[in-house]
Amino acid sequence: MAMPCTWASWSLAMGSLCSRFTRSKGGYDVHDGATCTTYVRVTGGGDNGRGVAEYVSPDDITAATCSSAVGGNVNCGTGAAVTHSAGSNFLIYWDADESRELENGPSITKASGGTLLSATGCSGNNGTKNTPTLTADLLGDWREELVLRESSNTALRVYTTTDVTTRRIYTLMHDPTYRAQVAFEQSGYNQPPHAGFHIGAGMADPPKPDIHVK
């Protein structure tokens, strides 16, 4: 299912939304979710097939955006170019720091460079979109697992990080926003799930979850 006009791909506790434009309009913008005030608008031509926004560097104090229709990454607050490696497909919490890594098909890379996982024998889905079968905090750390199909279509594989982190927060599936977006990841336009609170540089303790698992 592709949204015809705009699609809100990202939200933070501060209420910012990043919308990518499809079809003839192209590009994307970052705006206030409550007032619709536009922080950043980036123009582009043609359909903007993919787009993400997230803290992808441990040093980020503002998220960066990237889309397939507009080259390079920009700061969500100022629109200034940032030097991180461009990645517009998918995101995943994988290593020890609070920033997110870039996921594309069967591989995970750092925005600063370097491959963290290359899943030999597995493939992405949806043709050129090259999306994973699922990314979600399945095992209860707060980092996310990567579910991929084998290229032979005979099995699914679940990959998990082995990196040890000093960050201690509850499993992301206890956050109702994240939990709903994991379901949406499988039933709507396939994009990575996001928590309802900030994870990254300068993060505060997350709010106490109101979800209880028996």
Where are these regions (language model features)?
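Extracytoplasmic/lumenal domain signature
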Residues: 1-214
